[in-house]
Amino acid sequence: MEIRVFRHDDFEEVITLWERCDLLRPWNDPEMDIERKLNHDPDLFLVAEVAGEVVGSIMGGYDGHRGAAYYLGVHPDYRGRGIANALISRLEKKLIARGCPKINLMVRGDNDAVISMYEKLEYEMQDSVLLLGKRLIEDQEY
């Protein structure tokens, strides 16, 4: 397995991966999300590759105050092999190198498997907060 920075020729493979991992939502256009990421810290967009196939991804961000991780997904046939842990670990190292003191994650409350995985990596529930959002630019429905 190789963890590397996303390349433009990974585009379709990553979107297919996200579909298989049920990461897509109708209000987020994955092509636009990738294009936006490629314009802002593209080296924090990582993929895991096995035998030439993209089998995992994570999209990281750092705003100078906190780090974040999005679009963590591993192909169902490759789960349980440490790929998600490797992606998170590599992102954490990249964030630490930038001086990032903390990473925050958003996980759906009913996603027990992912919550458990993060807890094994020493992530813990923080103060209960309500996530508010406001769409500034409407994506076309995917």
From Swiss-Prot:
SUPFAM superfamilies: Acyl-CoA N-acyltransferases (Nat). Keywords: Acyltransferase, Transferase. Its EC number is 2.3.1.-. It comes from the Bacteria. Signal peptide: none annotated. Residues 1-142 form the N-acetyltransferase domain. GO terms for molecular function: acyltransferase activity, transferring groups other than amino-acyl groups. Pfam families: Acetyltransf_1. CDD domains: NAT_SF. Disulfide bonds: none annotated. HAMAP family: Acetyltransf_YpeA. Belongs to the acetyltransferase family. YpeA subfamily. PANTHER family: ABC SUPERFAMILY TRANSPORT PROTEIN (PTHR43072:SF51), N-ACETYLTRANSFERASE (PTHR43072). This is Acetyltransferase SG1711. It comes from Sodalis glossinidius (strain morsitans).
